[in-house]
Amino acid sequence: RPNWEERSRLCGRDLIRAFIYLCGGTRWTRLPNFGNYPIMEEKMGFAKKCCAIGCSTEDFRMVC
């Protein structure tokens, strides 16, 4: 289990689990249109950043 006070490098399954743990639950909603590319690109950039340099709890809160 990563220490959420510091940056942790999370890739693949670990990133997905952390995202669900921190952002999941009743707050989740479906995107009404998958053509909303700016949001999708932002999420992909977040995933690449977490894998390359790591991310903190605060980083997750900005994309939840």
From Swiss-Prot:
Q: Which cysteines are joined by disulfide bonds?
A: C11-C51, C23-C64, C50-C55
Q: Which UniProt keywords apply?
A: Disulfide bond, Hormone, Secreted
Entry's Gene Ontology cellular component terms: extracellular region
Q: Which InterPro entries match?
A: Insulin-like, Insulin-like_sf, Insulin_CS, Insulin_family
Q: Does the keyword Plastid apply?
A: no
UniProt key word Secreted: yes
Q: What is its main location?
A: secreted
The subcellular localization recorded is: Secreted
Tell me which Gene3D superfamilies the record gives: Insulin-like
Which top-level group of life is the source organism from?
A: Eukaryota
GO MF annotation list: hormone activity
Q: How does it assemble?
A: Heterodimer of a B chain and an A chain linked by two disulfide bonds.
Q: Which family does it belong to?
A: Belongs to the insulin family.
What is this protein identified as?
Answer: Relaxin
To which species is this protein native?
Leucoraja erinaceus (Little skate)
